[in-house]
Every structure is written in structure tokens, then in C-alpha cells.
Amino acid sequence: MSSAAAAPETAKALDRRSRKLAREVDAMEFAPPTAYVSDPLVYARKTAEAYLTRFAKPRPRALLLGMNPGPYGMAQTGVPFGEVSIVRDWMGIEGKVGSPDPVHPKRPIEGFDCARSEVSGRRLWGWAEERFGTPEAFFERMVVWNYCPLVFMEASGKIRTPEKLFADEREPLFQACDDALREVVGILRPGMIVGVG
């Protein structure tokens, strides 16, 4: 089966797995100083699904793996490292993005109206655009995925990265994310996995 013919099945399998991961991690509870937790795989589902449907292909040369969503990237667009302007203008993905409940007042979800820039997303996708020209050329060789779909925030609005969670929170979270990653690798069968971010 060609890559083009297998792509719809690959996208469907990744979509199912991302939905399962979202259900698993959304059932978890996190103690202070974590005050807010959001999951763009839930409230930005349509754009997350559009990303997978359009770009996920089997047997990429590399799976580029980020840790978790940034506040002005995937948290706004549902796309890993989802710098708004690049997702909209280069990838051609745009749509209505919902909002988590509750939403941190200092970290509103504005979706594609967000004017802030995700530095890591600008770097990653800027490199991809410069190196490959078109998203189609990039995604023939690469797939980008985030290990953990959750954004963690303290009451102040400060972002907490997953490794700063308490051990009894981290362990079940990492187990769910590890299980999902193993399945994602099995679905994609990439030549290599590269951590980015």
C-alpha cells in the first residue's frame, strides 16, 4: 500500500489514539501549585483532527516529539508547536477553537485570534518552511507529535512543565503518555524519533 493510500487509515488511527489519551489524562487530578489544566485535544479537537487528517502519513523518516503544548501554540490551535500564523497561513488549517473550563484569566484561549507568538513553534515550523518549502514536502518526511497533551498552570499563570509535577501525579500521567507514544510509533513506524523543544 502506498503512503498516500495508507495516510487516511494512519490519520484515523492517530485520531483514535489521541482521543483515548485525552480521556485518560483528563480523568487525572493535579494538586497545587497546579491550579489550571487544559487539554487542546478536547477544546481544539476540530483543528487537531484537521492536522492529523491532512498531514499524518505512515513511515515518516522522523517523528519529531515535543513535550507538551505551549500557551501560545498548541494551546491556541490544537496543532503541536502550533504557532498561529504558520498553522493558518502555511499549513492552511484554521477553525473555531473552544475553550477549557475553567480557563485561566491570564491565559485566555483566543484560538486563531491569538496575537502572541509561540517561540518554539515559530522556530520549528519556520525551519520546516525554509528547509522544505511546502507543508506537503515536510510531512512526506516528518510527523510532529506532543508526548503529553496537557497544559499545566499555577494560580499566577506560570506554566508548569510535566516534570515539575509531584511524583504521584507524574507517574500515572507518564504511564498514559508512554502507552500512547508506543502505539503512535507502532502506527507511524518512523525511521527515528527526535525530541524537540
Where are these regions (language model features)?
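A polyanion-binding, active-site-adjacent surface
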Residues: 8-192
